[in-house]
Swiss-Prot record:
It comes from Passalora fulva. It is a single-pass type II membrane protein. This is Putative lipase ATG15. GO terms for cellular component: multivesicular body membrane; vacuolar lumen. Pfam families: Lipase_3. It is found in: Endosome, Multivesicular body membrane; Prevacuolar compartment membrane. The lineage of its organism: Eukaryota, Fungi, Dikarya, Ascomycota, Pezizomycotina. The chain crosses the membrane at residues 4-24. The gene is ATG15. InterPro entries: AB_hydrolase_fold (IPR029058), ATG15_Lipase (IPR050805), Fungal_lipase-type (IPR002921).
Length: 661
């Protein structure tokens, strides 16, 4: 039985796993099936300008690690530190989240090319802050001036460049006292005596070329541990569920880590005002990366800034790139269009806030492969590892363009969360393919299509009226049972009629005498029972008058059983007589049990009638033995047994008397 249960469980898990794999490796056409056919793209010269000015090669740049910035978020929101990396420092780096370390590369080479990016004309930090405050205050985008600039960016069609940016997004360095000390930015708070600050916050690695004309910020992504407590997993999970779920990880499996209370009273409804307020809290990664970017640009005011990130670091990088119009390359980032919409990131004329997936010329490029369910936007089933670990990845739409390696078709990979790690992407994907994949937009993509969002400014009042209903039902029932069964009467017949305002009272008296107790009750039960019942209806309320006469039998039973069984007598025959009296409320039943089976002269039994304790048979004659009158010897033998071993039928063999020699 246990083996069968395990087999069924294995089959269920196999089916669930197969279904999750098929859904995770969705093609672009399958993802478009969830889109809205009513989306109309706004007119504009974007594509014409882009085609009129093809990308130009701008040579190769060599980057070196210059600084590492760390910005606190939850436990230390005011912490902002940096450490300068000296040119002679020999560092160790890990590409698999601290499992193994190797000598860090000294230089990173990447090719540059020109591209056109559509962004705001005025992008100072104060200008960006004013635009976002306007949206959060009035719920409408601010009227600002936009421009299309030709800038330098990484060459996304070059394999070595893509590989370099993946390494910048993946690295985690080990520092020693010889490499320098962590210094507070702008003389900030001193956290020297606090332990654990390095596990709280966002870390960015700053790379610069020889002329300091271009700076690359590589942001650290989500820690790989499923459960809280390892590295920055707890804080990363909170931001993942804020950015990637439809409503703060509510309305899904119970394992999801809920990060706010914005769900509506009905299913698939969410308070958008509450949702935006949760994202605006100072401790979240978007605001931390804005402060980090502000300090880097103050240190390199005349440099172009490029961004790179993996997983959550890639999402934060793309949000920063959309805000300031910066070239960005991300790796295995989960869909980020939903987060950009809720943060109120500015959009050019002709686009409403929330349509970032339909915008061209953003400068955002997301690299990933089809075997990663997080990147594909399908790691959200109840049995998926993301849901088991508490992550709620419900979005399916990326901003900008997606550049997808089809590892399921080309390499025969199976879909699994283990392929999400950046070390797997670097060694098994980017280095294996000869060229990077082509990049494209998914303009018809729609997030959370089955959810309804409503606005709430906190002034609405809700009035509810309670209604009460009173009903009284009385059931009158007459029963006569002739064939009692194991759990009740087998031939039960019932008549019932509902009435209103009816009261019923009854009294019963019983006398029982048992001579032969059985396994589950008395075998020769003799019972005398009298019962009376009355029903009355008040005269205040007109109602039908119902009179019920109930009579219970008075029975007399005599039983003699020679072959008792496990649950009763096997040789029982019953004769029942009853004398009905129409004018009486009771009837008398006489039951006589006669046994007609093989002789069994047992007169004393124990153990519920199963064991005979009579002495061995002896002669019944009262005369003394003589040569003509000898005692009779009888041999008792069992001819048929029960399934549990006791004798069911006996046989007695008589022997002729023998004369004394």
């Amino acid at each position: 039985m246990i083996w069968n249960g395990r087999l069924v469980l294995a089959c269920v898990l196999l089916i669930a796993g197969c279904s999750g794999q098929v859904d995770a490796a969705r093609t672009r056409e399958q993802r478009k099936a969830f889109g809205s056919p009513n989306i109309v793209l706004p007119p504009g010269p974007a594509h014409e300008v882009a085609s009129a000015k093809p990308a130009r090669a701008l040579g190769e740049k060599t980057f070196t690690l210059r600084h590492v910035y760390h910005h606190g978020t939850h436990n230390y929101p005011n912490l902002h530190r940096y450490i300068d990396i000296q040119p002679e420092s020999k560092l160790q780096v890990s590409y698999d989240d601290g499992t193994t370390y190797e000598e860090a590369e000294v230089a990173f080479k990447a090719k540059a090319q020109s591209r056109i990016v559509q962004r705001m004309a005025h992008r100072s930090h104060s200008d960006i802050d004013a635009v976002q405050v306007h949206y959060f205050t009035y719920g409408q985008p601010a009227d600002v001036e936009w421009t299309e600039d030709e800038i330098a960016g990484p060459n996304i069609s070059d394999k070595s460049t893509v590989l370099t940016f993946a390494k910048m997004a993946a690295n985690a360095y080990i520092f020693s006292r010889k490499d320098g000390e962590w210094q507070p930015v702008k003389g900030g708070f001193n956290y020297t005596d606090d332990f654990g600050w390095e596990q709280d916050g966002l870390r960015g690695h700053i790379f610069a070329d020889e002329a300091n004309s271009t700076v690359v910020i590589g942001l650290k992504g989500t820690s790989p541990a499923i459960f809280d407590g390892a590295d920055t997993t707890g804080n990363d999970k909170l931001n993942d569920n804020l950015f990637g779920s439809c409503c703060c990880a509510q309305g899904g499996p119970f394992t999801w880590k809920k990060v706010c209370d914005c769900a509506g009273s009905s299913a698939y409804t969410c308070n958008n005002t509450c949702l935006v307020k949760s994202l605006r809290e100072k401790g979240h990664y978007y605001w931390a990366v804005k402060d980090l970017y502000r300090n880097v640009t103050e240190r390199y005011p005349d440099s172009e800034v490029w961004l790179s990130g993996h997983s959550l670091g890639g999402v934060v990088s793309s949000l920063l790139g959309l805000t300031y119009g910066l070239p960005t390359l991300t790796f295995e980032a989960f869909p980020d269009a939903m987060a950009a919409s809720r943060l109120g990131l500015p959009t050019p004329p002709g686009y409403k806030i929330g349509s970032h997936q339909a915008r061209p010329m953003t400068g955002i490029h997301h690299f990933g492969h089809t075997a990663d369910p997080i990147y594909m936007g399908s790691c959200n089933g109840g049995t998926s590892f993301c849901s088991i670990g508490g992550y709620a990845f419900e979005g399916v739409c990326h901003t900008g363009e997606t550049c997808t390696y089809d590892t399921v078709r080309d390499l025969g990979w199976r879909v699994g969360i283990g392929t999400h790690k950046i070390v797997s992407v670097i060694k098994d994907v980017i280095k294996v393919y000869d060229q990077p994949p082509s990049c494209e937009q998914d303009v018809e993509c729609v997030d959370c299509y089955n959810w309804k969002y409503f606005e709430n400014n906190g002034t609405e009042t809700t009035t509810s009226k309670a209604s009460t209903a009173t009903s009284t039902t009385t059931r009158t029932r007459t029963e006569t049972c002739k064939t009692p069964g194991w759990w009740g009467c087998l031939d039960e017949s019932t008549t019932s009629a509902p009435t209103t305002s009816t009261s019923t009272s009854s009294s019963t008296s019983s006398t029982r005498t048992c001579e032969t107790p059985g396994w589950f009750g008395c075998k020769d039960e003799t019972t005398t029972t009298s019962s009376s019942s009355s029903i009355s209806s008040p005269s205040a309320t007109p109602a039908p008058t119902i009179t019920t006469t109930s009579s219970l039998p008075t029975s007399t039973s005599t039983s003699t059983c020679k072959t008792p069984g496990w649950f009763g007598c096997y040789d029982e025959s019953t004769t029942t007589s009853a004398t009905p009296k129409p004018s009486s409320t009771a009837r008398t039943v006489t039951k006589t049990k006669t046994t007609t089976s093989d002789d069994d002269d047992c007169t004393s039994r124990e153990w519920f009638g199963l064991i005979c304790v009579d002495p061995s048979p002896t002669t019944a004659s009262g005369s003394s033995p003589s040569s003509t009158n000898l005692p009779t010897t009888r041999r008792k033998m069992c001819t048929k047994r029960h399934w549990y071993g006791t004798c069911k039928q006996w046989r007695f063999d008589d022997f002729d008397p023998k004369n004394d020699l």
